[in-house]
Amino acid sequence: MKPKEVLEKWIDCFSKADAYHIAELYATNAVNHQVANDPIIGKESIYKMFVNEFATAKMVCMVENIFEDGEWAIMEWKDSLGLRGCGFFHVKDNKIVFQRGYWDKLSFLKQHNLPIE
């Protein structure tokens, strides 16, 4: 699969709040670094992160743009509450080996009435 195709599967799993299948898209030692948080290392830890996140807030990923460059897929997104962000996905052998996401954590917490850390 091309990186864009892996990202499209990721978006589908994210939209369904499917932590198991989204985690299956990551390599065993993958890193997911949402810059507002510490990096999450390893497929099992990434799975647990998504389980927790999907249980905490209803998240929506509305794609604005997807780009592909070599082993990278890049996405600009928004959600139904007006939050915007972008994600960078490094894909090797059909698995995400590194992901970095940029979004405004304070806005997210306020929109979902979550405690501000």
Language model region names:
Residues 1-17, 25:
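Short, aromatic-enriched amphipathic alpha-helices that serve as compact interaction elements
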